[in-house]
Design a protein with these regions (language model features):
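Active-site region of the double-stranded beta-helix
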Residues: 1-138, 148-199
Length: 199
């Protein structure tokens, strides 16, 4: 809508959970590979194979970008979401690589997302993002282009003056895949949490 960037900060007033920025590619790939043990239809296995293939084949940022494009553009993805929701993901111990970058097992995040947004491909995109818990008084900062979603809790959101909103799923509104791919920062990295000064 306008040329302004939109960095944001969320300040937690209550216990708060957010998804923000991408987890390491190996962790994301391991999360999707967990789905291979399920009884999936050939169509869902094809989509899952394309996602995992993209995560293996390119540099990290290109791999994450390509995987998001596949998830959001393949018309068979809602079927994969539904099948994984029915079968569930087995919970794994905290040290498992698929849990890297997530405060909880990604299986829990997926269950929460499909409960609120059934059939939505964004539930799979959510598995690719860092899950960050905030305590009251903590804040999370995000540069422009960092994909994020707020899961629960109450907070104060502060952002630069901009009308720009590009969605990556978890919505009934239009998802502009081309625009999302053009402006999203697909580099993985640890979220920037700011703790309150206790002085």
């Amino acid at each position: 809508k306008d040329a302004s960037a939109k960095p944001e900060l969320i300040y937690a007033l209550t216990d708060f959970h957010a998804l923000t920025g991408f987890r390491p590619r190996k962790a994301v790939r391991a999360t999707f590979e967990r789905m291979l043990s399920q009884s999936l239809t050939p169509a869902s296995l094809d989509v899952l194979g394309a996602i995992i293939g993209a995560l293996k084949s390119f540099s990290e940022s290109k791999a994450l970008s390509r995987a998001v494009e596949i998830i959001l553009s393949d018309p068979r993805t809602p079927g994969l979401v539904d099948e994984v929701a029915v079968h569930g993901l087995d919970e794994l111990p905290a040290g498992h690589i698929s849990r890297s970058g997530s405060a909880v097992d990604p299986a829990q995040t997926f269950c929460e997302l499909v409960t609120d947004y059934p059939h939505d491909p964004g539930a799979l995109v959510g598995l690719m993002l860092n899950r960050v818990p905030l305590q009251p008084g903590e804040a999370l900062t995000m540069d422009a282009g960092v994909l994020h979603a707020y899961l629960f809790g109450t907070g104060i959101e502060i952002m630069a003056s901009s009308d720009n909103v590009v969605r990556g799923g978890l919505t009934s509104k239009h998802v502009d895949i081309e625009q999302l791919s053009a402006i999203t920062d697909f580099h993985s990295g640890a979220p920037r949490v700011v703790e309150p000064d206790r002085a």
